[in-house]
């Protein structure tokens, strides 16, 4: 199951750790994502801003969809 809900079409794996193996975290998100959900990892370190990792293909899909709204 996703760690965070409320963003339709996006599967969120959430990590708050000082050391993160991002490839393992993405693999977990990809394995847990339902069909048609974009696997993502939202991650942060203490006293640092949140970052989001996703595949380039999924990022381009979001970018193109957002461009249609502008």
Give the residues covered by each predicted segment.
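Solvent-exposed, well-ordered amphipathic alpha-helical segments
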Residues: 5-11, 32-39, 65-70
């Amino acid at each position: 199951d996703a760690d965070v809900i409320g963003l339709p079409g996006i599967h969120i794996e959430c990590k708050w750790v000082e050391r993160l193996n991002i490839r393992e975290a993405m693999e977990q998100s990809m394995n847990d994502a339902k069909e048609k959900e974009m696997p993502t990892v939202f991650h942060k370190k203490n006293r640092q801003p949140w970052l989001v990792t996703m595949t380039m293909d999924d990022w381009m899909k979001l970018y193109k969809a957002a461009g249609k709204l502008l």
